[in-house]
Amino acid sequence: MDGHPPGTAEVDLGPLGLDGGGHLLVARALAPLPPGGRLRVTGSDGHLGVHLQAWARRRGHGVEGTTVVRGAADRQRLAGAVRAGEPGAVAGRADATWGLAARGALVEAGAPPLAGADLDERAVVWTELAPKLYAQAAAGQWDPATAIDWDPPALPGEVEAAVVQVMTYLVENEQAALAVPARFLGRIHPHFREVVQFLATQVADEARHVEVFTRRALLCGGELGISGAGGRASLQTLLDEPDWPTASFLLSALGEGTFLSLLSFLERRAPDPVTARIARLALQDEARHVAFAMGHLGEHLRAAPGLRSRLRAAVLRRHDALASTAGLADSVDDALVVLAAGAFTPAAIGAGWRRVRQLEVEMDEARRRRLVRLGFADAEATELSALHTRNFM
Amino acid sequence: MVTRPLVLGAVAYDAKVVTIWEGFRRYFLARDLPFDFVLYSHYERQVEALVGGQIDVAWNSPLAWVRTRRLAPLARAVAMRDTDRDLTSVVVVRADSPVRTPAELAGRAVGTGAVDSPQGTLLPLALLADTPVEVRRFEVGVGLHGDHVGGERDAARALAAGAVEAACMLDANHLLFSKEGTLPPGGTRVVAVTPHFDHCNFSVVADHDALDRFVTLLLAMDYADPATRPLMDLEGLTAWLPGRTDGYDQLEAAVDRFGFYGPAGEVAAAGYRP
Ligand SMILES: [Fe+2]
Ligand SMILES: [Fe+2]
């Protein structure tokens, strides 16, 4: 072809040395040769001979003068290499030996297998919604500094205190909602890239929620409210759940699902524009978190209907564990009433009270709808919704 | 009867030596070769242990091989890395130096590696043996026979800084120092290159029942095997080859010329304290 006998070739490096990238040209010229093939290297760099033999020796090639005799080490290195699945398709099971490799990468064998990523089955972690929801999440990230007009409102003292109490409650719930996906993130095999990416955005969302609710609590210079023991006990049961589908069910399908009603209520009933705005922004994020959980749980349940009884048992177990605790603290319930009342007159408080009771009805209805969507029978959905924690999350 | 394990000695010139020999030990044990290793702090201690029968095989530097053969004339080299064959060392000057030939280094300062480095000191200095140069040694890792690259790198730094007129180093280290920027790329010129020489080998002085099996298993180590390739990468080879001993004549001559060891293997170099 180039006038060379078969198995031989020639490459001219011009003035380029092997200390300046010349090895790339040599390796490229060697690649198509068979082992034993000969490559004559020419060039004007003063160190070419010295550097060529040093470079070639270390890579298992022979050298005769400035002719490289091709070795096989580069091909041996990739002898047992496999593809980490296909870039456009998700495998049924992700192999630990694929490690952190990009989906579809050619994986050189020999590294230690990926440790700790035990959630490696498509049926357990994947949802077809993941790529779309991740893209939405990436596009929907908002900046707390600019998305909200942080002018302090001038509310009556008791109403402001009620807002602060609700914010105090929200912050600890957001911390739980951050910690749970964060704990599972590292256990999900990175082959399921979009799931990992989505959960990373979920964690980042919760970080913003923690920020904006904290900032609203401190906006008017008051002290933070009470963190009730019952609420924290309820959240601890979420953190303790070691099973991914169960944790996702309790946190997102039930807890964050219930929060959709709560945040929508806060947006509608907020006594000041800052509270309304941050409830609105958090609500948009939470809707994604719930959609993701409903997606992967729905697909998982279709593949393994036995999971349904596991999820049911988890609700009962959690209810029993929390039976001796207060659930939603009086301080939070009262604060919601005052927030929705906007004033301390009997008529306003009465209206606030009715709105909060109506909120609880809405929460229950929405939970039952989601449970039915996950395939629970109507009666079971009613039973389980009623057993959901009084702390909402 | 249970075979006494084959005991190999290696010098702990770097922490990775433990990883390497633990890995090789697993490789041999998995193939029913009873195998242990002992680490030494320097090559003189290892050579004495080999000659004294405390170890069966020594993973020897070329200089350690020279001493082993002087202490035990029947010593053999049973295997070596593909990367141990046909090395060269260079004497380099700055590109703008007036020095064109080794003889023009007369009266000038030449930086070298440690006193006991074959590639960084003994072999390149032998090229200048008839030229009265002022040797400036950079003593890093004395006793490690040049396994530690620090002395050569310090000599290269001194060259770049203008503190010496020339510096001595292995061909591969000249490439390394030029790529990493210790030497300015294209900023140096080679004024002398040694002939090819060989580097490390597995030396033995007495027979052991398992020696043939050790060599067979070593030579069978396959770079295509993902279980052993990381160890071979760490040890810096792509294939083990049978030992050969005709690549050490240059070093034998340099050792005699500089009186590093006596003819019977006694340590004779002035100021050499491993
Ligand atoms: Fe949140
Ligand atoms: Fe959330």
What function would you assign to each model-found segment?
Chain B
Residues 1-54, 60-62, 226-274:
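N-terminal hydrophobic or amphipathic helices and topogenic motifs
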Residues 2-10, 81-93, 145-146, 180-218, ...:
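Periplasmic-binding protein-like
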Residues 5-31, 40, 63, 87-155, ...:
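Bilobed "Venus flytrap"/periplasmic-binding protein-like clamshell domains
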Residues 35-37, 135, 190:
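Generic structural signal for residues in well-ordered beta-strands
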Residues 45-49, 151-158, 164:
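Short, hydrophobic alpha-helical packing/hinge segments within bilobed ligand-binding/sensory domains
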Residues 49-104, 116:
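Acidic, polar ligand-binding/catalytic clefts
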Residues 54, 109, 163:
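Conserved functional loop/turn residues at catalytic and ligand-binding sites
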Residues 59-72, 129, 157-186:
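A ligand-binding cleft/hinge motif common to bilobed small-molecule-binding domains
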